[in-house]
């Protein structure tokens, strides 16, 4: 950034330099990246800060640099005014966070531009998957957890259940399925971007629920990957959720095929008291040295493999090929169908569309199964001394 600012100063006739940043701010100033940026590059006049979803009611000021942020998901508009001082730098003279509500009239010209862009979503993107944005995939009468619930409430959530189940369904029902069953599918909370309201669930809503990333094919949307982990590593994955995700809530894991119980009162890295496979009909004990097929999205696979470094070696996950060789490039294990990447959001859309039409109107219905949870992640809140020390892992 410093080099870019110097280049601008040398080659351009500018009054103000604004940085649009996806680094974010934190309460701990030493870890607040956009504040560190303001200190390191004092020639920046204004930093529009994103990533951490922070609503700054007042700007953060370091020297002559202002850091501002208006929250998340277009809920607010940030409005500010600045006046140039005699030395050429700028002083903020007004700053306001304006909630975006239905009381605000749409700007017709802007809405028209948006509508034109939305038309290209169908023709330039969704057509290659056989969808249109307004296409109804399923009708829903289930109260799903919110995206925030997945991060803030440390327990099983039906939103995580349906997404992880969708991965298994899509892989095992793909046109060129290799016949190897999926043992476990994993969805971290940090990859989920929205929930499903009651009523019609459309393609647009499913895409919005898992809209992150891009594949090796250059097409938007993270693809699914297939890796292998040992039984011991699957136990470690459960411990990551139980112990690590309280410090990094985006690492809360929602699984299909892997059930576990944890006690939040036990020692860190020793909170999981029971973990096993569940094929839908029976409990299957994990074998520490056996390899199990695991499906996740590309980003999550890369993130989970970094756990060893993040935990200073205390927790180790090494995703592998079917022969046990460690994976070096996760793009090698992207799941494809007829030569095209199987995107995570498309997997969810396919699963939604596969549900039984229970009311006879020609549209699938989200099953009652998802109206409750199913012992995939159980919380044992006991403080009994026996429960606090039993089954050390």
Give residue spans per PLM region.
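Acidic, metal/ion-coordinating pockets
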Residues: 1-102, 245
């Amino acid at each position: 950034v410093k080099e870019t600012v110097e280049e601008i100063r040398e080659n351009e006739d500018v009054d103000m330099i604004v940085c649009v940043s996806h680094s974010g701010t934190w309460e701990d100033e030493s870890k607040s990246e956009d504040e560190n940026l303001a200190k390191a590059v004092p020639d920046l006049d204004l930093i529009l800060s994103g990533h951490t979803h922070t609503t700054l009611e007042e700007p953060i000021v370091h020297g002559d640099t202002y850091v501002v942020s208006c929250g998340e998901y277009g809920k607010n508009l940030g409005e500010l005014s600045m006046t140039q001082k005699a030395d050429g730098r700028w002083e903020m003279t007004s700053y306001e966070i304006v909630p975006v509500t239905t009381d605000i009239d749409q700007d017709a010209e802007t809405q028209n531009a948006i509508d034109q862009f939305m038309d290209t979503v169908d023709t330039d993107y969704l057509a290659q998957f056989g969808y249109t944005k307004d296409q109804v995939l399923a009708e829903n009468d289930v109260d799903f957890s919110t995206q925030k619930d997945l991060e803030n409430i440390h327990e099983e959530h039906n939103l995580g259940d349906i997404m992880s189940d969708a991965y298994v369904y899509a892989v095992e029902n793909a046109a060129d399925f290799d016949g190897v069953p999926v043992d476990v599918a994993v969805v971290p909370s940090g990859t989920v971007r929205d929930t499903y309201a009651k009523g019609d669930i459309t393609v647009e809503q499913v895409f919005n629920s898992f809209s992150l990333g891009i594949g090796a094919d250059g097409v938007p949307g993270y693809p699914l990957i297939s890796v292998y982990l040992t039984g011991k590593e699957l136990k470690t994955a459960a411990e990551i959720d139980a112990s690590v995700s309280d410090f990094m809530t985006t690492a809360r894991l929602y699984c299909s095929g892997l059930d576990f119980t944890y006690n939040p009162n036990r020692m860190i890295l020793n909170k999981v008291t029971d973990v096993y496979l569940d094929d839908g009909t029976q409990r299957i004990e994990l074998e520490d040295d056996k390899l199990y097929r695991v499906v996740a999205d590309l980003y999550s696979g890369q993130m989970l493999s970094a756990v060893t470094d993040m935990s200073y070696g205390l927790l180790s996950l090494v995703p592998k090929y079917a022969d046990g060789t460690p994976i070096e490039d996760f793009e090698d294990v992207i799941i494809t169908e007829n030569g095209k990447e199987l995107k995570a959001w498309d997997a969810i859309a396919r699963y939604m569309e596969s549900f039984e039409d229970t009311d006879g109107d020609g549209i699938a219905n989200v099953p009652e199964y998802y109206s409750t949870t199913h012992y995939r992640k159980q919380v044992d809140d006991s403080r009994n001394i026996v429960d606090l020390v039993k089954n050390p892992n």
